[in-house]
Swiss-Prot record:
Alphabetical GO biological process terms: translation
PANTHER family the UniProt entry points to: 50S RIBOSOMAL PROTEIN L9
Family classification: Belongs to the bacterial ribosomal protein bL9 family.
Gene assigned in the entry: rplI
Protein name: Large ribosomal subunit protein bL9
GO cellular component assignments: ribonucleoprotein complex; ribosome
Alphabetized PROSITE patterns for the sequence: RIBOSOMAL_L9
Keywords, alphabetical: Ribonucleoprotein, Ribosomal protein, RNA-binding, rRNA-binding
One example GO MF annotation: rRNA binding
Gene3D superfamilies to which the protein is assigned, alphabetical: Ribosomal protein L9, C-terminal domain, Ribosomal protein L9, N-terminal domain
Species of provenance: Psychrobacter cryohalolentis (strain ATCC BAA-1226 / DSM 17306 / VKM B-2378 / K5)
Keyword NAD (UniProt): no
Protein origin, superkingdom: Bacteria
Length: 170
């Protein structure tokens, strides 16, 4: 089944492309959700008439996402969690926890936008976390996890080791 994409779809194509998909995927998912149109002559003409409007909407979405990304630059989220002697957390810090911490600090981020490719965070330390606000716009924030009981010797030792490595290279 050939369809015209009305928006970018990951692993399928960009706005305006005509692509082949399985009939069920097109009929039951893409077309009912307004993400695509069947590629008939009438729909192709109708799409070409709306192309500028759809591209303008896409540009607005990118601009809004870029503004949000600019607001997230240099954000450092500090979270406290219970941990064992070796810095291993009892439990883990996931996307929901990070989204909640960002919301509490006044920045609206949906948990689906937070990307943790290696899974949840399970150790005390500093982590760079990507937030994908749009398929073209990604922001990176720093998440620092500290021990809830105030014993952050592992983090301090790691920082001291990093500083010593920096000085030894010079």
């Amino acid at each position: 089944m050939q369809i015209i994409l009305l928006q970018r779809i990951v692993n399928l194509g960009k706005l305006g492309e005509t692509v082949d998909v399985k009939p069920g995927y097109g009929r039951n998912f893409l077309i009912p959700l307004g993400k695509a149109l069947p590629a008939t002559k009438a729909n192709i003409e109708k799409f070409e008439a709306r192309r500028a409007e759809l591209e303008a909407e896409e540009a607005k979405e990118v601009a809004v996402a870029q503004e949000r990304a600019d607001a997230l630059t240099d954000v450092n989220v500090i979270m406290r969690a219970k941990s064992g002697d070796e810095g291993k957390l009892f439990g883990s810090i996931g996307t929901r926890d990070i989204a909640e911490a960002l919301t509490n600090s006044g920045l609206e981020v949906d948990r689906a936008e937070i990307k943790l490719p290696e899974g949840t965070l399970r150790q005390i330390g500093e982590y760079n976390v990507d937030i994908q606000l749009h398929h073209d716009v990604t922001a990176t924030i720093l998440v620092t996890i500290l021990s809830e009981d105030g014993d952050n010797e592992d983090l301090d030792e790691d920082n001291a080791a990093d500083e010593n490595e920096d000085y030894s290279e010079e």
